[in-house]
Amino acid sequence: MGWADSAIETLRTGSKAVIRPHGGSMRPRVLSGAEVTLEPANASSVEVGDIVLCRVSGNVYLHLVKATEGAGPDRRVLIGNNRGGVNGWTKAVYGRAIEIRNP
């Protein structure tokens, strides 16, 4: 089971979820161990600059939407971290951060 599987399942039911991601790729916006509250979202409902829980090439990230392309069910988003890295394009967006409580 992956670090965010439980949150992804909760978001899929239409409920909010809380995660505590670890790592430094989103500093200073999200610090390692922060409590992040997510609301359900998908690629069509997020905008550039949103912090989202998503899957890119089989990996789950809590990263930024860097760009969008397309519309409706064909819309996809470019995901990257807060330090200049880019993960790639995806349609697999599960949630958007609505509250971040850094330690």
Predicted segments with their positions:
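Extended hydrophobic leader/signal-anchor segments used for secretion and membrane insertion
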Residues: 1-103
